[in-house]
Amino acid sequence: MATVKVTLVKSLIGRLANHKACVKGLGLRRIGHTVEVQDTPENRGMINKAHYLLRVEG
């Protein structure tokens, strides 16, 4: 299955709890942290919800 690189580029301070949960669900911990996740509808939904905090490649 295809993968997508996701990087946290903005802080989670003061963000909505749902958006923080999505970022945590993707496995991101700190600004600049990059993870490679599978390109599934579930992960795409989390990326779309918190898109303004992330950089997505691939």
Swiss-Prot record:
GO process annotations (BP): translation
Cellular component terms (Gene Ontology): cytosolic large ribosomal subunit
Pfam families hit by this protein: Ribosomal_L30
Superkingdom field: Bacteria
The keyword Ribonucleoprotein appears for this protein: yes
GO molecular function: structural constituent of ribosome
Classification via CDD domains: Ribosomal_L30
Keyword field: Ribonucleoprotein, Ribosomal protein
Subunit field text: Part of the 50S ribosomal subunit.
Membership in a protein family: Belongs to the universal ribosomal protein uL30 family.
PANTHER family: LARGE RIBOSOMAL SUBUNIT PROTEIN UL30M (PTHR15892:SF2), MITOCHONDRIAL RIBOSOMAL PROTEIN L30 (PTHR15892)
Classification via HAMAP family: Ribosomal_uL30_B
The protein's name in its UniProt record: Large ribosomal subunit protein uL30
Biological source species: Azotobacter vinelandii (strain DJ / ATCC BAA-1303)
Gene designation per UniProt: rpmD
